[in-house]
């Protein structure tokens, strides 16, 4: 058995977690009360598949291997009273009494530490129920107080307690134009610095990029958070589909980092997903393998605002689902490689890993997204993502040059030196990206 424990931290983490578990339940044929749908004697996905994410009780109920953590009770109360309230184990929903007030230091040093032992105790019990724990899947935002502060604290502790296990993050990155709090740049830089050596692979998701996808592809004039979360859930589901269903090329958690992370610090793959279209457009789309593969290389299908045409690809994973044949995939990849727009770094010429899972994608009931017979999720480690770091670093510098809002952090027991240390670490990260993008054999040097 290769189990995975999902940990959702903070408001964004918990709400994305809700959308994901609703989708997983539908994909495996599990009802909101945890029992199987009529006519099924086993969950869809084979004996091995569903047990990576669900544990089975003696009465035949399926319980998610998931933990919800927040410093204020509102979001977790929604889970406790929502449609899926009977699905989760009540002790796996952990809420504090007061929130982190968008302050990394409150989540990391003061309020967050008070509930840390409860969380770790619960994680320990969940890992004891696993035969062969594969790793952790972390969902949180980088801009909030709980997601950044408590999220990074928890990752640090898990590194100490479960050093060899994989730790994958889905991190909501602050959107360039759509901001929910003034101090997002501080929280993002501080949490990235703290988690850089603890997370093995971080898939970033940026609200603005997803807003644009909802507006452009799903015809939603004013997308709300549930529309965004349903789209993010599709991506998370595609990334984890190979762990939950049978396919010709199965990928496990360790394989992601082996294939995508050339150096430990450069572990921020760019995520693209196709096809994304509304029900009204569904009948007009051909949706062939080569079409959806090409779409993944267009900036409009990416989960982070940056231009991949300006960067170079170090490694790429294409995870297909549904009615897909290997020959079609090979042709589609050959087509992409022949185009000049896709540049690979010269020290990694092969660059493409393919995963195929035969379970077709499912759309969440009531969501605007139409279900398709096949879909692809592309994870690519490209130097273009450095653009996202440059943006947030610039905002950090503007505020920190005036020491704006710093007293709130220092008042919670943080030292001012941590700000400069974190900023220097991110400057080093930007330099790392520039370095890996430069050619290892410049053409002009022909001396022997």
UniProtKB/Swiss-Prot annotation:
Active site location: 255
Enzyme Commission (EC) number: 3.6.5.-
Localization, UniProt: Cytoplasm, Cytoskeleton
Required cofactor(s): Mg(2+)
Job description of the protein: Tubulin is the major constituent of microtubules, a cylinder consisting of laterally associated linear protofilaments composed of alpha- and beta-tubulin heterodimers. Microtubules grow by the addition of GTP-tubulin dimers to the microtubule end, where a stabilizing cap forms. Below the cap, tubulin dimers are in GDP-bound state, owing to GTPase activity of alpha-tubulin.
InterPro entries cross-referenced by the UniProt entry: Alpha_tubulin (IPR002452), Tub_FtsZ_C (IPR008280), Tubulin (IPR000217), Tubulin/FtsZ-like_C (IPR037103), Tubulin/FtsZ_2-layer-sand-dom (IPR018316), Tubulin/FtsZ_GTPase_sf (IPR036525), Tubulin_C (IPR023123), Tubulin_CS (IPR017975)
Gene this protein is translated from: TUB1
Keyword Cytoplasm: yes
Pfam families named in the record: Tubulin (PF00091), Tubulin_C (PF03953)
SMART domains: Tubulin, Tubulin_C
Binding residues for GTP: 11, 72, 141, 145-146, 180, 207, 229
Enzyme class: hydrolase
UniProt-listed PANTHER family: TUBULIN (PTHR11588)
Matches recorded under SUPFAM superfamilies: Tubulin C-terminal domain-like (SSF55307), Tubulin nucleotide-binding domain-like (SSF52490)
Family recorded in the similarity comment: Belongs to the tubulin family.
Protein name, per record: Tubulin alpha chain
UniProt site positions, description: Involved in polymerization: 448
Lineage: Eukaryota, Fungi, Dikarya, Ascomycota, Saccharomycotina
């Amino acid at each position: 058995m290769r189990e995975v424990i999902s940990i959702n931290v903070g408001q964004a983490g918990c709400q994305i977690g809700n959308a994901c578990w609703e989708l997983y339940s539908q994909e495996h044929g599990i009802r909101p009360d945890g029992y199987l749908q009529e006519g099924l004697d086993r969950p869809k996905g084979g004996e091995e598949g569903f047990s990576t994410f669900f544990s089975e009780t003696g009465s035949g109920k399926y319980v998610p291997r998931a933990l919800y953590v927040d410093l204020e009770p509102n979001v977790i109360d929604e889970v406790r009273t929502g449609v899926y309230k009977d699905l989760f184990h009540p002790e796996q929903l952990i809420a504090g009494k007061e929130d982190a007030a968008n302050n990394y230091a409150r989540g990391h040093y003061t309020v967050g530490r008070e509930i840390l032992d409860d969380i770790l105790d619960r994680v320990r019990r969940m890992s004891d129920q696993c035969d062969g724990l594969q790793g952790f899947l972390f969902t949180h935002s980088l801009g909030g107080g709980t997601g950044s502060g408590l999220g990074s604290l928890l990752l640090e502790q898990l590194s100490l307690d479960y050093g060899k296990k994989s730790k994958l993050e889905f991190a909501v990155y602050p959107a360039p134009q759509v901001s929910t709090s003034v101090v997002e740049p501080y929280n993002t830089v501080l949490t990235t610095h703290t988690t850089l050596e603890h997370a093995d692979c971080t898939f970033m998701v940026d609200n603005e990029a997803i807003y644009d996808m909802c507006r452009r592809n799903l015809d939603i004039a004013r997308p709300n958070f549930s529309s965004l979360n349903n789209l993010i859930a599709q991506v998370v589901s595609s990334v984890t589909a190979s762990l939950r269903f049978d396919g010709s090329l199965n990928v496990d958690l360790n394989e992601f980092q082996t294939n995508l992370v050339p150096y430990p610090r450069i572990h921020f793959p760019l995520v693209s997903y196709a096809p994304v279209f509304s029900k009204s457009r569904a009948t007009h789309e051909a949706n062939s393998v080569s079409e959806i593969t090409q779409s993944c290389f267009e900036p409009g299908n990416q989960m982070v605002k940056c231009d991949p045409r300006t960067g170079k690809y170090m490694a790429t994973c294409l995870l297909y689902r549904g009615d897909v044949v290997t020959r079609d995939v090979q042709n589609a990849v050959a087509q992409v490689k022949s185009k000049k727009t896709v540049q690979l770094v010269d020290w990694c010429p092969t660059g493409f890993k393919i995963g195929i899972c035969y379970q077709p994608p499912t759309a969440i009931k009531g969501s605007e997204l139409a279900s398709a017979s096949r879909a692809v999720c592309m994870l690519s480690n490209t130097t273009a993502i450095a653009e996202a770091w440059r943006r947030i670093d610039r905002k950090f510098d503007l505020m920190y040059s005036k020491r704006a809002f710093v007293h709130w952090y220092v008042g919670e027991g943080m030292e001012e030196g941590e700000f400069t240390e974190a900023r220097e670490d991110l400057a080093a990260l930007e330099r790392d990206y520039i370095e890996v993008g430069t050619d290892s054999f410049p053409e002009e040097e022909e001396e022997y």
